[in-house]
Amino acid sequence: MNGTARAPALGRLGTYRTDRSYAWNYEHGPAWAGPVPAVPATAGQRFFGLEVASRLGIAAGLLLNARWIDFYARCGYDILTYKTVRSRHRVCHPMPNWLFVDPADAAALDEAASAVRARARPHAGTGADWTSTVSFGMPSRDPGVWMADVAQARHLLAPRQVLVVSVVASPAAGDTADSIIADFGRLAAMAREAGAQVVEANLSCPNVVSAEGDLYLDAALSGRIAQALRQGAGTLPVLLKIGHVPDEARLAALLRAVAGQASGLVVVNGLSRPVLDGAGTAAFGTGRRQAGILGRGIHAISVQEVARASALIERDRLDLQVVGVGGVACAEDAERYFEAGACAVLMGSAPMFDPALAARMKALHPEW
């Protein structure tokens, strides 16, 4: 990389304005002045029994509402995940919500939970090179608002496109496991009623400090949640989004616990790390030292986990499939996930910087 290269201007990075609030992006985004790409024709594939034009899509996070889903559907993404919703209103964390990890720290990401440094502007390069860190806290509109918007999003999709709705429980202080399980079950039923074709439960948000952030680490509880989701979702496919599980025995136990209720797992939901500014204090502010890491720096770890989960599913003959997500910014990145055993590949931050990514992938790999 040329040492004289300049960092891109803040606010002109992609469809999500990182210099604006979540509320602004919800009301005014996606902020994209460029053209919508021409989308190549494909023969089509299956995604948990549903016909899709491709097994390429967008993970929970970027698609804030129906307007965002419509834009990315027209750009050629065929599996579209509505940003995580709750059974009650939840405000977003204050700004900043999206920062960029120092390249040296991003390159050194591994199993150790070492702190990383972050700043508002990315270093020189493009979105394919960047590792981001985010801290939103899984905000949600009231159910009446998001259910109507989900219905609108479903109406906007073309044939052979699938709407996934991501849900998460909202435990209050003193809530029991039973109340968390019941909340997930209610949400699955609400998502189904609103028009979801697939229900995804987020068991692993790396940027919240409340109990819903690490449910996937409890295999028995995850199994009970999967059962409640299955009851609420009816015949719809049920996916569980999990975080990084470096211990193979623990991952195997989780897979066995949810098999028979869940249809598959989405692997992985970023890495949780301490995120610091140049002065060594919490980059996102007081009480928000831990945040989610996504983008280039987590790709290798995420592919490895997909491969491990796929091997365990085959070994134990479980009726589960794995959806890969993490650090996909080119066709070669997606190919590594398919080779590792993923049935589909979702993208998180890269489509924000590069909406035409799926169209280029389809041109190279119409079989996907």
Question: What residue ranges belong to the model's regions?
Answer:
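Alpha/beta catalytic cores of nucleotide-metabolism and tRNA/nucleoside-modifying enzymes
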Residues: 1-38, 105-114, 296-321, 329-368
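Glycine/Thr-rich beta-alpha phosphate-binding loop at enzyme active sites
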Residues: 26-40, 203-218, 255-318, 360
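Active-site entrance/lid segments in N-terminal catalytic domains of soluble metabolic enzymes
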Residues: 29-32, 67, 73-257
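N-terminal amphipathic alpha-helix/helix-capping segment at the start of soluble metabolic enzymes
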Residues: 34-57, 147-160, 310
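Proline-centered loop/turn at the N-terminus of a beta-strand
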Residues: 55, 162, 236-237, 264, ...
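Glycine-rich beta-to-alpha transition loops that act as phosphate-gripper elements at the mouths
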Residues: 60-63, 166-170, 242-248, 319-332
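Glycine-rich phosphate-binding active-site loops on the catalytic face of alpha/beta enzymes
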Residues: 76-90, 203-205, 264-274, 327-328, ...
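C-terminal helical cap(s) of enzyme catalytic domains, especially alpha/beta-barrels
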Residues: 89-107, 275-291, 350-368
